[in-house]
Curated annotation (Swiss-Prot):
Subunit structure: F-type ATPases have 2 components, F(1) - the catalytic core - and F(0) - the membrane proton channel. F(1) has five subunits: alpha(3), beta(3), gamma(1), delta(1), epsilon(1). F(0) has three main subunits: a(1), b(2) and c(10-14). The alpha and beta chains form an alternating ring which encloses part of the gamma chain. F(1) is attached to F(0) by a central stalk formed by the gamma and epsilon chains, while a peripheral stalk is formed by the delta and b chains.
Species: Pseudoalteromonas translucida (strain TAC 125)
Protein name: ATP synthase subunit c
Site (Reversibly protonated during proton transport): D60
Any Gene Ontology CC annotation: proton-transporting ATP synthase complex
Stated family: Belongs to the ATPase C chain family.
SUPFAM superfamilies: F1F0 ATP synthase subunit C (SSF81333)
Compartment(s) of residence: Cell inner membrane
GN (gene name): atpE
Residue ranges crossing the lipid bilayer per the database entry: 10-30, 57-77
Membrane topology: Multi-pass membrane protein
CDD domains from the UniProt entry: ATP-synt_Fo_c_ATPE
């Protein structure tokens, strides 16, 4: 029984950790591409900024959903 609990804790930690790493990589890539696009075509910066913020919210939502799933695994199952 202790082995199952230990493995469950490791699974939850990996789920939250990899979700955070993936979110950070996604934000970094998106920010870099946004800056490149604004440097190439400055007149498109306002519309690109709106799209970037929408995508940032979606990327962040993926990490929050991962934390929610991890909490269900930790406390319910």
């Amino acid at each position: 029984m202790e082995l199952v609990l230990g493995l469950k804790y490791i699974a939850v930690a990996l789920l939250i950790g990899f979700g955070a790493i993936g979110t950070a990589v996604g934000f970094g890539n998106m920010g870099g591409k946004f800056l490149e696009a604004c440097a190439r075509q400055p007149e498109l910066a306002p519309s690109l900024q709106v799209k970037m913020f929408i995508l940032a919210g979606l990327i962040d939502a993926v990490a929050m959903i991962g934390v929610g799933i991890a909490m269900v695994l930790l406390f319910v199952l």
